[in-house]
Amino acid sequence: MSDKKTAIITGASGGIGAGLVERFLQEGYSVVATSRDAHRKLTASGSLVLLEGDIGKQQTAAQAVEAAINNFGTIDVLVNNAGIFLNKPFTDFTTEDFDALVSVNLLGFFYITQRTVKEMLKQKSGCVVSITAALADRPIAGTNGSISMMTKGGLNSAIQNLATEYAKDGIRFNAVAPGVVNTPMHPDDPNDSTLQPAMKKATVKDIVDAVLYLAQAGHVSGEILHVDGAAPARRW
């Protein structure tokens, strides 16, 4: 088994996820990358195990944790990157929309995080970083994602509670809350840049840098790190 640190990254095949995989490998981590189409977008190697599946299913979560332990021996970092965002008026959300958001954003966090924490308790160390959303606590008029933000805001609360629950066990929990990021999830809309005072979208690198900081900052836990070009300042 390798002595390198190991990271599990969900939603790993595109946008922020692909950037996270690349950067963690560059930083010397072994990586287990999960997504629905991991093998189509990524190339496995001695340091990179690919796992395809629906992260909202218990089986996928179990397989990811098993892959990390069986191949690399530990789980040092879990990055809960998988997520979906639906933008529509509250009265237009359907039951199918609600179920999809809960499956990916909540069950996709719950199943794999619970299993990972059980392993981290054995190690007496570990770090969980989750990607949430700046809109969860900084709503913007005209951006109608109330049910999406119900899930992301719930994650923020859970993360802060988990940070307290497991502080004595050496396990840290934090979140990165992006604003608008230049990824395929966000169509090329020139108005997006006006949603934050910086007047430009965040890049994938901006988000990856924030995740790496939280993964390596040993005394930081329970933080929701906004990466949104000063939008919380509400000065524009």
PLM regions with names:
Residues A167, R172, V220-G222:
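Short, small/polar-rich loop/turn modules that mediate ligand/substrate recognition or access, typified
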Residues V129-G154, I159-Q160, T164-K168:
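Catalytic loop of short-chain dehydrogenase/reductase
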Residues Q196-I207:
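A conserved structural motif in NAD(P)-dependent oxidoreductases
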Residues K205-V227, P232:
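C-terminal substrate-recognition "lid" of short-chain dehydrogenase/reductases
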Residues S13-G14:
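Conserved glycine-rich cofactor-binding loop
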Residues P89-F90, D97-V102, D192-S193:
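Substrate-binding pocket helix/loop in short-chain dehydrogenase/reductase
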Residues T113-Q114, Q160:
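A short, exposed helix-loop element centered on a Lys and neighboring polar residues
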